[in-house]
Structures are given as C-alpha cells and as structure tokens.
From Swiss-Prot:
Glycans are attached at N103, N118, N160, N234. Pfam families: DAN (PF03045). Expressed in the anterior endomesoderm of the early gastrula with expression expanded laterally around the margin at the endoderm/mesoderm boundary. Gene3D superfamilies: Cystine-knot cytokines (2.10.90.10). Keywords: Developmental protein, Differentiation, Disulfide bond, Glycoprotein, Neurogenesis, Secreted, Signal, Wnt signaling pathway. The long chain interacts with nodal/nr-1, bmp4 and wnt8, thereby inhibiting their function. The short chain interacts with nodal/nr-1 but not bmp4 or wnt8. One of its GO terms (cellular component) is extracellular region. Residues 1-20 form the signal peptide. It comes from Xenopus tropicalis (Western clawed frog). This is Cerberus. Inhibits wnt, nodal/nr-1 and bmp signaling in the embryo to promote head formation and anterior neural induction. Within the endoderm, acts as an essential mediator of nodal/nr-1-induced cardiogenesis in the overlying mesoderm.
Amino acid sequence: MLLCVLKIYIIFCLVNDGAGKRSEVRGRTKTYSHNSRGYFRKERGMGKNKILLVNTKGFDQPHIGQGSFGLVAELFDSTRTDTSRKEPDINKVKLFSTAAHANKSSRNIGIFRRKAFNGSRRNIFSRQPFNKRNTDVTEKPGAKMFWNNFLVKMNGAPQNTSHGGKPQEIMKEACKTLPFTQNIVHENCDRMVIQNNLCFGKCISLHVPNQQDRRNTCAHCLPSKFTLNHLALNCTGSNNVVKVVMMVEECACEAHKNNYHQTAQFNMDASTTLHN
C-alpha cells in the first residue's frame, strides 16, 4: 500500500515539473529583429527594462548590453499574459548594424568611383569624328586661273564670258605714302638732308598679246599730289648748284596705255633712310 502511494506521489511530482517547464517556455516573449546578425529577446523573469541580446552568428552564451548595435525600440510590458503567443509586427524591434552600414557605404563609394573612372576613361580614349573639311587645303583662284580664262575670252569667246577671278581680289590695290629721309648730294658740295615721302605699293597691270597696236595697260604707284622745290647747295667754288626736288604729299595707282611708263626721278643715295 505504501509502495503504491509512493509511486503515485512520484508520478504527480514529475507531471507538475513538466507542466511548470512548459508554462515557463510559453511565458517567454521573444522579439526578433530584421537583421541577420542578431536579435533581441525579452525574458519575463529578467525585470521590466532589461533586454537580452542574443548573438545568432556564434550562438555563444547570451549577454546583457547594447554591443555594437544601434537600437531604437520600445520595451514590452513584463505583465503580459501567457495566452498571447503571436506578437504583432508593430512590437518587433528593428535593428541595424553601424558596421554593416559603414561597409555598405564604402561599397557604394567604391562602385561610384569605378563608374566615374570608367566614364572618364571612355571620354579620354573615345574616337573623335574625323573632320575631312579641316584637312582639305582650300585653293583660292589665283593668277593662273585668271590668265587661262582671260585667254579663252580673247580667243573668240563671247563678250559676256566671266573670268574666274573675284572682283575683290582683282581690284585689290595697295599704294601707300611712306616718309623717309632724303639726302641731296653733289660733287664739291655739302650734303643736304630733307624729309620727303615715297610711293610704295601694288597696282594692277594688264597685257593683251597678239594685238596690232600692242596696247598695254599698266598701273603704277605714283605721286598724285606733289610740289617741286628748288634747293641751293653750298658748294666750294664760284658756281652755284641748284637742285629741283619733288616733294611728294600723296600717292595713288595711275594707269598708262603706252609702251613705256614714266618714272619719277629722285636724287637719292645709299644712305636713304625710311621711316615707318
């Protein structure tokens, strides 16, 4: 009889011990974070404001603290009932790792730098379009083309035939008046130095071959406005020497339709000096 009572007592104790363990397991409230490196779990028997940090990476002994994690969470109430096994999403603790965030930022910076380097390298080594217009040498109509067209015109071509030269290029003349220092010299006389002007430039000339009257039209840069001055030189002797000098004021291109052209005579020597 005593043996039966002892067996019943042992069975009753075992049943109560298993039921207590199951209720303790059900009473625990677990909260997991969305981070794969760890989660937080709140124990019912640990107090009101204590959080148990469980490291899921190594599954070592749990420790209480914050570690290297930044936590923004709302603590659960310790007086929660055992009937609520499922927890709503609003009570879950969101956890992020500062180290993982730093690694992600460094990876993003590295990707941005690689993209920028590749873009700059493409800009440097990109093929530039070949511009054929810049390589071609532009040939302007010169004297040869003008002469050939002129010969065609003079050999029986119609009167309205146009030549290849441009009027701006054909009629381009340059006749300038340049100042210089002129020396008047004579034998047994002192040298006289005066300030005068000379004519320098490019004018149009025209020669028509195979013509009976041999008409030539030439234009020369000649004085268009001048004065004649008589200069008396200081000489050693009884004879007085007077020189007639053309004092040039303006120059222009003048055409002559003769076989010869008139040139102006200047009393100049090798020591003549031009002034710019």
